[in-house]
Amino acid sequence: MPKKKYAEIYRRLKTKIETGEYEFQEMLPSENQLILTYDCSRNTIRRAISALVMDGYVQTMQGKGVRNIFRPALQTSFTIGGIESFKESALRNHQTPKTQVLCFTEIIADEKIANRTGFPAGSQLYYIQRLHYLDGKALILNHNYFLKNIAVNLTKEIAEGSIYEYLENELHISIVTSKRVMTVEKMTEIDEKYLQLGDYNCLAVVSSQTFNSDGVMFEYTQSRHRPDFFRFQDNAVRRKC
């Protein structure tokens, strides 16, 4: 229950920050005020604030309080951040999502696929091509590979919605960490066919390997983004030895 409580407070504060209720550089209410507002313990508030710090929304200032350091992105961009489903990312960016499944099939990883994805050769996989729309524009082409023995009974219909919702809510899988590589690559014929690149001849590519709580890599995804709508946001902390 405490975990759900701090997570709910985190979501509420994050929404207030993203919608501008707390303006850029504004101080958040004091710890005591937040305790009264959310009827919770001091530790619960501190856990919620720590999560906001880790995600780059706020900065704690000793003796002063907590300052909002989040500046909303322009609506013409699509910002990616933590481990999120496309649906979650779209809603966080205040945009309307739609997903079209172009291909849904079952494959066995050969050496070429193994080298590309990191799955061992011989792994049984779902391979999915999905075209993601935001506010009616086709912006992202995803190539997804999921381990069949983890994403059990995955279907095209589920892929049209949210695969992560299915994994977490139906299969009770904990999605823990993701390794990402971002590159700029020349467009392919498939990119040109679906993404309406216009005068662009390249796009932003995010390749990710995602792991569950058992340390098993269950997903490899290559997301190919229209460059005029792509924005990556990270939170970096300088650590002194």
Where are these predicted regions, by residue range?
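Beta-hairpin "wing" of winged helix-turn-helix
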Residues: 54-63, 69
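C-terminal all-alpha effector/ligand-binding and dimerization domain
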Residues: 96-241
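Extreme N-terminal segment that seeds HTH/winged-HTH DNA-binding domains in transcriptional regulators
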Residues: 1-42
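Extended, compositionally biased flexible segments
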Residues: 60, 84-87, 91-95
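Short, cationic-aromatic polyanion-contact patches
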Residues: 4-6, 30, 67-81
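Short, hydrophobic-biased segments on the C-terminal half of alpha helices
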Residues: 49-50
